[in-house]
C-alpha cells in the first residue's frame, strides 16, 4: 500500500504512476520539446530575416547598399542563429524520441551552450543596430536608419525573434535542469 491508501503493483510503482496519473517526466519532455520548437521557429525566423535583408538607395549618381554581411556582428548573428535552429530541430526530435538520462543531461548542457551563443550574437548585433539608429557623435559616426529605414526595421525584427528564441531556450534549460539536476 502507498501512503495515500491505494495499492500499487510493482510495475505501476516503478513507472511512477499513482492513481492512474501519468508521470510528470513525460509532461516535462513535451514541454521542453515545445520550447525547443518555439526557439527553433524564432531563430529560423531571425536567420531568414537577416539573410534576405538588404536595401539600396540612390542619391544622384551614387548608389549605396546596406546588407547584413557588411558587419562582423551581423555575420556572427546570422551564423549563430543558423547553428541554433539546426541544433534545436535535432534536439527537439531527440528529446521526444529518447528519454535516456544521459541524453537528457547532454541536451541540457548543449542547450545552455547554444543559449549563451544566441545571447552573445544578439547582444553584438544589438550594439551595431544601436549605432546604426543613433550614431556616435565623438568619432563622427552618423545614424543610418533614417536613410536605410526598411533595413533597420528588418534588423529590429530579427533581433526580437532571436531574443525570443533565447528566452524559450533558457526556459527549456531551467526545466531540463529541474528534471535532471545532476546534468549541471
Swiss-Prot record:
Residues 52-76, 133-154 are extracellular. It comes from the Eukaryota. The chain crosses the membrane at residues 31-51, 77-97, 112-132, 155-175. Coiled coil: none annotated. It is a multi-pass membrane protein. One of its GO terms (cellular component) is plasma membrane. The keyword Membrane applies. Residues 1-30, 98-111, 176-184 are cytoplasmic. Its main location: membrane. Keywords: Cell membrane, Membrane, Transmembrane, Transmembrane helix. The keyword Transmembrane helix applies. It holds the Pfam family CASP_dom. InterPro entries: CASP/CASPL (IPR006459), CASP_dom (IPR006702), CASPL (IPR044173). It is found in: Cell membrane. Homodimer and heterodimers. Belongs to the Casparian strip membrane proteins (CASP) family. PANTHER family: CASP-LIKE PROTEIN 1U1. This is CASP-like protein 1U1. It comes from Marchantia polymorpha (Common liverwort). The lineage of its organism: Eukaryota, Viridiplantae, Streptophyta, Embryophyta, Marchantiophyta.
Amino acid at each position: 500500500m502507498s501512503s495515500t491508501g491505494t495499492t500499487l503493483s510493482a510495475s505501476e510503482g516503478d513507472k511512477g504512476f499513482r492513481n492512474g496519473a501519468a508521470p510528470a517526466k513525460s509532461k516535462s519532455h513535451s514541454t521542453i520539446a515545445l520550447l525547443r520548437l518555439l526557439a527553433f521557429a524564432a531563430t529560423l525566423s531571425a536567420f531568414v530575416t537577416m539573410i534576405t535583408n538588404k536595401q539600396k538607395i540612390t542619391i544622384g549618381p551614387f548608389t549605396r547598399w546596406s546588407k547584413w554581411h557588411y558587419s562582423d556582428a551581423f555575420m556572427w548573428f546570422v551564423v549563430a542563429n543558423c547553428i541554433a535552429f539546426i541544433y534545436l530541430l535535432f534536439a527537439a526530435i531527440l528529446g521526444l524520441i529518447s528519454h535516456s538520462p544521459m541524453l537528457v543531461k547532454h541536451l541540457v548542457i548543449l542547450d545552455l551552450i547554444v543559449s549563451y551563443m544566441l545571447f552573445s550574437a544578439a547582444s553584438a548585433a544589438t550594439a551595431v543596430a544601436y549605432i546604426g539608429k543613433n550614431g556616435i557623435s565623438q568619432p563622427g559616426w552618423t545614424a543610418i536608419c533614417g536613410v536605410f529605414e526598411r533595413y533597420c526595421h528588418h534588423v529590429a525584427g530579427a533581433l526580437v525573434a532571436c531574443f525570443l528564441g533565447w528566452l524559450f531556450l533558457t526556459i527549456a534549460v531551467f526545466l531540463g535542469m529541474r528534471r535532471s539536476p545532476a546534468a549541471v
